């Protein structure tokens, strides 16, 4: 087996593990935020145990990447007419805590493990597909793909900044969802 085939298998294996862990954790009776804390807490630990680290590169910020990460998700949702009508299912503090754990873990798993093996575009496609499968909302896919591609551009320059932006955008989405009464996740 070639190194490339092994790398692809490793990346796809992690994508399957992430999807399966979240799917299992969301089984009743847990709420969404508790499921995220459980699944992503375990996945983050596994990623660290596997050696995942955010590379210490510091070549500054990628303005195009940050813009795409920031506007990609809402623009993609708008283009495909995705409108979350449900109220956020849990309280603000619990959702903020859960989505910050999710952001850090997604950077350690998708960003530090899957993306180096599969590349940014394939990882963005799998990242978006995972969300569509788990959430059952296909109209989020384009926005999530664009969001990940923006983070990938930043990650190439400074992975820690990508993680901080990911966490900040998740946090802003939680607050916006609670203020508007429309869940963004």
Identify what each model region corresponds to.
Residues 2-51, 60-64:
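Alpha-helical transmembrane segments in multi-pass membrane proteins
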């Amino acid at each position: 087996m070639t190194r490339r085939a092994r790398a692809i298998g490793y990346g796809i294996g992690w994508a399957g593990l992430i999807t399966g862990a979240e799917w299992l954790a969301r089984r009743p009776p847990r709420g969404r935020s508790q499921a995220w804390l459980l699944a992503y807490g375990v996945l983050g630990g596994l990623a660290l145990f596997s050696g995942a680290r955010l590379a210490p590169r510091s070549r500054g910020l990628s303005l195009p990447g940050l813009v795409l990460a920031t506007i990609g998700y809402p623009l993609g949702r708008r283009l495909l007419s995705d409108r979350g009508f449900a109220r956020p299912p849990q309280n603000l503090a619990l959702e903020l805590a859960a989505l910050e754990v999710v952001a850090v873990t997604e950077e350690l798993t998708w960003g530090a493990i899957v993306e180096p093996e599969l590349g940014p575009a394939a990882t963005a496609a799998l990242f978006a597909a995972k969300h569509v499968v788990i959430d059952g909302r296909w109209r989020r896919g384009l926005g999530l793909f664009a969001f990940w591609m923006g983070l990938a551009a930043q990650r190439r320059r400074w992975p820690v900044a990508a993680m901080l932006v990911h966490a900040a955008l998740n946090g802003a989405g939680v607050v916006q969802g609670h203020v508007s009464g429309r869940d963004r996740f």
